[in-house]
A protein has these predicted regions:
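Conserved mid-core segment of classical short-chain dehydrogenase/reductases
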Residues: 72, 80, 93-110, 151-154, ...
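C-terminal substrate-recognition "lid" of short-chain dehydrogenase/reductases
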Residues: 82, 122, 136, 214-240
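Catalytic loop of short-chain dehydrogenase/reductase
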Residues: 12, 16-17, 93-95, 112, ...
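Canonical Rossmann dinucleotide-binding motif of NAD(H)/NADP(H)-dependent dehydrogenases/reductases
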Residues: 2-34
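A glycine/serine/threonine-rich, flexible loop-to-helix segment
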Residues: 102, 171, 175, 182-217
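Short, small/polar-rich loop/turn modules that mediate ligand/substrate recognition or access, typified
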Residues: 174, 179, 233-235
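Short C-terminal tail/terminal secondary-structure segment
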Residues: 17, 98, 201, 210, ...
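Catalytic Tyr-X3-Lys loop
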Residues: 102-122, 133-140, 162, 209
């Protein structure tokens, strides 16, 4: 699943979940990684330091990908450092407002909706011209399993909007050599420590002994989609199941 010398932007890559594991796994396969974060500077630097200590290249970039200026800042830094972006992972999403429909706040719900689709819209516009020119690109979004909706109505609507936005874009992008795919998990637990995330990424015994879906499960499939092996997969919605 080599991604040797590809440049990957992973948004929301400094948390304890999927984004961080995706960044680590893409680096494991040879990609140069832009580790995006909003507030978690120390955790972002931890990811970068680990990648570099293992022979890879990575940078941490603070940027709010829910707004146009933040997306422009992120990609500008990526271009200055690596000259291109081949892979972009749309990971972070909306807030959490699980209020019942009769009392939910429409203003907050609309904010949730915008936060789910804004990163894809802004980053797609910034990245597709270069990807089209090179006839190679990968866009992958983290959405939500349609059969495992959460208690938060606006969160569910936002994830559905992101999923549909990506699905409606894939055919046009495919004609230019760019694949667009969506990952649709249900609940996914976080890793308790950075050490645990590394152990899973390196397929140590914790990986083979796992009892439920983990951030690394998502990272492995995302990395496959971003490799040459995933060249002929586009428009897919890949679900992950959670053992209750």
């Amino acid at each position: 699943m080599s991604s040797q010398d590809k440049v990957a932007v992973v948004t929301g890559a400094a948390g304890k979940g999927m984004g961080r594991s995706i960044a680590l796994t893409l680096a494991r396969e040879g990609a140069n990684v832009v580790v995006n974060y909003l507030n978690s500077k120390d955790r972002a630097n931890e990811v970068v330091e680990y990648i570099e200590s293992n022979g890879g290249r990575a940078i941490a970039v603070q940027a709010n990908v829910f707004v146009k200026d933040g997306c422009e800042k992120l990609i500008d830094v990526a271009f200055k450092q690596f000259e291109k972006v081949d892979i972009c992972i749309i990971n972070p999403g909306a807030g959490w407002h699980p209020e019942p429909l009769d009392v939910f706040d429409p203003v907050l719900a609309l904010e949730d909706l915008v936060q789910e689709i804004a990163p894809f819209f802004h980053l797609m516009r910034l990245l597709l011209p270069g990807m089209y020119e090179r006839k190679w690109g990968r866009l992958v979004g983290i959405t939500l399993h349609p059969m495992q909706s959460s208690p938060a109505y606006s969160y569910n609507v936002g994830k559905a909007a992101r999923l549909q936005a990506m699905h409606l874009a894939y055919e046009e992008a495919w004609d230019q050599g760019v694949t667009i795919n969506a990952i649709a998990p249900g609940p996914v637990s976080h890793f308790e420590s950075f050490k645990q995330a590394i152990a899973y990424c390196n397929h140590e015994k914790e990986w083979s002994q796992r009892k439920n879906v983990s951030p690394q499960d998502i990272a492995e499939v995302v990395t496959f989609l971003c490799s040459e092996a995933g060249s002929y997969i586009s428009g897919s919605i890949i679900p992950f199941m959670f053992k209750k």
